[in-house]
């Protein structure tokens, strides 16, 4: 796309050097709202302009709300709990994904089991799990929680917390990084969107 003799010079008003900036929500190239060609946007816009309200399945609405407001409680048993705490700190900021910590199991949707589960601690894990309201989810974090890890052959260790409570997401690692746990949280949200929340 070179300049031919007689055409506008580079930098002239006919051919600006800087792309025009968007004004509000309008695309400067077309003058239409940004995303106006998106099929979803068109369907929603047509339905809203026709009826004045939006029709959706209640289950879809509940699922959407639940994935954006998961409350988690910590069940930190060993060194993995340090990475779990790091995930909620400002560097990773899990709350921007709608994943906020709670202190009580009665207010929590998700329990993160992080660390080595011993035989003495197993009844406490089950008791805390039973106090959580339905639907409830469990993330098993780290090799020890997943399958006993380094202490697998110890007489005092449960070889995986899935023997005590049902697990939804396994996060591998010894210890897993905060990024890995955050990825596990996003996988849980994806799973909830896929299977719904009314029946589990």
UniProtKB/Swiss-Prot annotation:
Gene3D superfamilies in UniProt: 3.40.50.12280
GO biological process, alphabetically ordered: aerobic respiration; electron transport coupled proton transport
The entry's keywords: 4Fe-4S, Cell inner membrane, Cell membrane, Iron, Iron-sulfur, Membrane, Metal-binding, NAD, Quinone, Translocase, Transport, Ubiquinone
Disulfide bonds: none
Amino-acid positions noted as binding [4Fe-4S] cluster in the UniProt annotation, renumbered to this chain: 79-80, 144, 174
Cofactor binding summary note: Binds 1 [4Fe-4S] cluster.
Cofactor section: [4Fe-4S] cluster
Enzymatic class: translocase
Membrane topology of this protein: Peripheral membrane protein
Record Pfam families: Oxidored_q6
Subunit composition and interactions: NDH-1 is composed of 14 different subunits. Subunits NuoB, C, D, E, F, and G constitute the peripheral sector of the complex.
Record's function text: NDH-1 shuttles electrons from NADH, via FMN and iron-sulfur (Fe-S) centers, to quinones in the respiratory chain. The immediate electron acceptor for the enzyme in this species is believed to be ubiquinone. Couples the redox reaction to proton translocation (for every two electrons transferred, four hydrogen ions are translocated across the cytoplasmic membrane), and thus conserves the redox energy in a proton gradient.
Protein family per UniProt: Belongs to the complex I 20 kDa subunit family.
Listed name of the protein: NADH-quinone oxidoreductase subunit B 2
Gene name of the record: nuoB2
């Amino acid at each position: 796309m070179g300049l031919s003799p007689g055409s506008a010079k580079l930098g002239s008003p006919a051919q600006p050097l800087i792309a025009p900036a968007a004004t509000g929500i309008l695309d400067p190239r077309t003058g239409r709202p940004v995303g106006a060609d998106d099929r979803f946007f068109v369907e929603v816009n047509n339905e809203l302009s026709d009826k004045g309200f939006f029709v959706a399945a209640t289950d879809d609405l509940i699922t959407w709300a639940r994935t954006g407001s998961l409350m988690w409680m910590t069940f930190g048993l060993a060194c993995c709990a340090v990475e779990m705490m790091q995930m909620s700190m400002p560097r990773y900021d899990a709350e921007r994904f709608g994943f906020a910590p709670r202190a009580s199991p009665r207010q929590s949707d998700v329990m993160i089991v992080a660390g080595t589960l011993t035989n003495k601690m197993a009844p406490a894990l089950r008791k805390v799990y039973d106090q959580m309201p339905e639907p409830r989810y469990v993330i098993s974090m780290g090799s020890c929680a997943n399958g006993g890890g380094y202490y697998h052959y110890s007489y005092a260790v449960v070889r995986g917390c899935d023997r005590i409570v049902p697990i939804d997401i396994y996060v591998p690692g010894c210890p897993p990084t905060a990024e890995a746990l955050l990825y596990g949280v996003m996988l849980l949200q994806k799973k909830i969107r896929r299977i719904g929340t009314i029946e589990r």
